Regions:
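Short, charged alpha-helical interaction segments and adjacent helix-coil junctions
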Residues: 2-44, 114-119, 237-365
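Short hinge/gating elements
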Residues: 52-60, 217-224, 246-250
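Short conserved micro-motifs at the rims of enzyme active sites and ligand-binding pockets
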Residues: 175-178, 224-229, 276-277
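Accessory alpha/beta interaction modules
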Residues: 1-211
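Extended serine/threonine-enriched, polar tracts that run as long, contiguous segments within proteins
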Residues: 193-235, 239-240
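Charged, alpha-helix-enriched surfaces in structured cytosolic catalytic cores
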Residues: 64, 68, 125, 230, ...
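Short, solvent-exposed polar/charged micro-motifs at secondary-structure junctions
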Residues: 92-98, 224-226, 259-260
Length: 365
């Protein structure tokens, strides 16, 4: 229905792209895998990868389609919300945001702030990092509300901040990172949506402002399609779908999705824009991998440095202990009436160095 079928093979696609110098230059700079993604899109084998920032933000653009992001966030939060504004990342306190492949911050109608983030390298996004992102959202809101209310500021004017993180892959076989293992703990089972907030072990009920919603998209792919036929299943299915065959099945189940896939297929008529989006996504992935590898290397260096320092400390401890033993031996030999010369000979046998033996006798005799 929405598959273009304009091109019969790769040569046909590349001939078409070559008519657009900007798109052609970008396309020729791609690695083979990314060229294949572009080719598959134009050949109607694959849809656009919506989990990448440029594609997600285009399809969920709040100026053009104000309802889509509202519906997605509503489905995740389990309550109806309305997105009223998309915020910029320019005033964020966190400058190391490059490990995300998609990041969008919005304000809801009630004043609360939500960030929707998609992470491809799950190991690079541990709980500590999520905590910092949430704190950044809260402080951003605090500054805005305080500046607006000035002398009338009251903490009760602050609204919730929701941190939504969608992990593309949480396969525990690929890494022993805590975030992977957490998603696949036995007690978790096949659950793919996890909601967390601050609670007290005594049952004390206080409502804090920071909520977390974590989604494992790979777990959803395994079990989600068979779950209840609800709004959340529909939107996550959209994000998880890669082929037009699956897209057609989705549209049979959710007819309202046909508009989205029609829009996706229309980009085939604008190669400069679609190849540009692929280029932007590729750059983000390269930056992600660079920063991830840099972080991994730094962590490895710090670990090795710590091991060296521990070994040095152990060596120093051993040296101190051996000095104490030599001192005790020398004192005992003195009591026994042993001569310096014989003591030097005895110690030289132990430490295999006559010079060292002489220094020890000089020090402790």
């Amino acid at each position: 229905m929405f598959q273009s079928k304009l091109f019969k093979d790769v040569a046909d696609v590349e001939s078409y792209i070559s008519n657009y110098p900007g798109a052609n230059a970008l396309y020729n700079s791609f690695r083979p895998r990314w060229k294949t993604l572009v080719q598959d899109y134009f050949l109607s084998k694959r849809t656009l990868p919506l989990t990448y920032d440029p594609f997600f933000k285009r399809i969920f653009n709040t100026d053009i389609h104000p309802d889509r992001l509202s519906r997605l966030i509503s489905a995740i939060l389990g309550q109806e919300v309305t997105v009223t504004e998309t915020l910029t990342n320019e005033d964020t306190l966190l400058k190391g945001n490059s490990l995300l492949i998609m990041d969008i911050i919005v304000r809801l109608a009630d004043g609360s702030i939500t960030t929707v983030e998609i992470q491809k390298i799950s190991a690079a996004f541990p709980a500590e990092r999520m905590s910092c992102y949430s704190a950044d959202l809260l402080l951003r809101q605090y500054e805005q509300v305080k500046n607006r209310l000035r002398d009338n500021f009251n903490y009760s004017a602050l609204k919730k901040v929701y941190t939504i993180v969608i992990f593309e892959n949480t396969d525990p076989q690929t890494t022993d990172a805590p975030v992977y293992q957490a998603f696949h703990a036995d007690k978790i089972g096949n659950q793919y949506l996890h909601h967390g907030t601050t609670i007290f072990n005594t049952g004390l009920e206080l409502e804090f402002l920071q909520d977390f919603y974590l989604i494992s998209l790979d777990v959803f792919r395994e079990v989600g399609y068979a779950k209840d036929d609800n709004e959340l299943t529909a939107w996550l299915s959209l994000l998880a779908t890669n082929t037009y065959e699956d897209a057609e099945l989705l549209c049979q189940k959710y007819p309202w999705m046909e508009e989205i896939f029609e829009e996706i297929s229309e980009y085939v008529h604008n190669p400069e824009e679609v190849v540009g989006m692929f280029s932007e996504a590729l750059k983000m992935m390269d930056d992600n991998m660079y920063h991830y590898m840099a972080d991994q290397y730094q962590a490895k260096v710090e670990k090795q440095q710590a091991e060296i320092e521990n070994q040095q400390a152990e060596i120093e401890n051993l040296q101190t202990e051996s000095q104490k033993l030599y001192q005790a031996l020398i004192e005992q030999w003195k009591k026994d009436g042993c001569t310096k010369e014989s003591a030097i000979s005895e110690i030289a046998v132990i430490c295999k160095s006559e010079d060292t033996a002489k220094k020890l006798i000089e020090k402790y005799w």
